[in-house]
Amino acid sequence: MADLLPEHPEFLWANPEPKKSYDVVIVGGGGHGLATAYYLAKNHGITNVAVLEKGWLAGGNMARNTTIIRSNYLWDESAGIYEKSLKLWEQLPEELDYDFLFSQRGVLNLAHTLGDVRESVRRVEANKFNGVDAEWLTPEQVKEVCPIINIGDDIRYPVMGATYQPRAGIAKHDHVAWAFARKANEMGVDIIQNCEVTGFLKDGEKVTGVKTTRGTIHAGKVALAGAGHSSVLAELAGFELPIQSHPLQALVSELFEPVHPTVVMSNHIHVYVSQAHKGELVMGAGIDSYNGYGQRGAFHVIEEQMAAAVELFPIFARAHVLRTWGGIVDTTMDASPIISKTPIQNLYVNCGWGTGGFKGTPGAGFTLAHTIANDEAHALNAPFSLERFETGHLIDEHGAAAVAH
């Protein structure tokens, strides 16, 4: 019966055979790859584009993230691209003509120590300076925003306050991917699933196409948007990326009536919690410490995040875990992304988003499309070049990442 519904994803875009050549080939059919294709078509009139996905569309990190959207980052460069992304989020449901349930319910980032308080107040002032909505809340005000949180002083790390971004929130991740895919397909973009890139065609230090499990595809330009497998793709192309891949786990509970009205994050005790539209509690924590490409992780990470969640939200002690899963996040040494040209001519890369990839989806697509179309970075992504790891102009956002990297 579900196959007959008009919103079933098979009816939203075509599944063509790959052509022999394209102006642009985008490797990675997740949110970032699809957003890039959409903005190439919309903003730059480039529609002879193929998005190649090795599995099913948006079946990687796009299907596995915890859907949090915010822009309250510390440094000017980060605030710029994430705030641009948030503004795009606010207009995309109408622009894409698709309701992906973007809910601006606000995000609380908790402070548990005097050090947390000082850093949080600093972050609020920096956000205001950059035009990002931000407030500092006392524990009592935190309780007003989220009535079920425990602000007592009898827990391991008492809540001493929180930063609050009212415009932040969550969205339905699958629907976001489908919305971008549908609109890009309408504009002439080919979306090709079950097509894994196995190598690159090169003429000296210039990329001219890709080798795939469905044949060779020639391309004027190639963009990499493979998230956790970006370093593997870069190695195939003949250069190295300064990233490491780690598993990142999440879990959901059984369904409940609405009890959790906002998003709560705690870097100090490594847990973040929201309630999805259907009613399940969605929780995440820090990355697993080891490197790997497995979409699973160690149980102790789940165990520790559940203990932290129950301490902050005693009511959750009665909840049952429905399922857990993992994604593969690509992290840089400064916890900031790479949206850049590469040492290979006509090859571009978007990676290194770590745990912040979903919230950056529109901004990543917008800036990468500009970089591809003009062969030079947009002002928003110029600071996120590969060269910063040589010059030392790093953008250290470990504190804003909300979980341990």
UniProtKB/Swiss-Prot annotation:
Family matches, as Pfam families: DAO
InterPro entries named in the record: FAD-dep_OxRdtase, FAD/NAD-bd_sf, Rhodanese-like_dom, SoxB
GO cellular component terms, semicolon-separated: cytoplasm
KW Cytoplasm (keyword) present: yes
Subcellular compartments: Cytoplasm
UniProt EC number: 1.5.3.24
Broad class of enzyme this protein falls into: oxidoreductase
Biological-process GO terms, alphabetical: tetrahydrofolate metabolic process
PANTHER family listed in its UniProt record: FAD-DEPENDENT OXIDOREDUCTASE DOMAIN-CONTAINING PROTEIN 1, SARCOSINE DEHYDROGENASE-RELATED
Primary role: In the presence of tetrahydrofolate, catalyzes the oxidative demethylation of sarcosine to yield glycine, 5,10-methylenetetrahydrofolate and hydrogen peroxide. In the absence of tetrahydrofolate, catalyzes the oxidative demethylation of sarcosine to yield glycine, formaldehyde and hydrogen peroxide.
Self-association state and partner proteins as the record states: Heterotetramer composed of subunits alpha (SoxA), beta (SoxB), gamma (SoxG) and delta (SoxD). May bind to both the delta subunit and the alpha-gamma complex and thereby stabilizes the association of the delta subunit with the alpha-gamma complex.
Family recorded in the similarity comment: Belongs to the SoxB family.
Official protein name in the record: Sarcosine oxidase subunit beta
Source organism of the structure: Corynebacterium sp. (strain P-1)
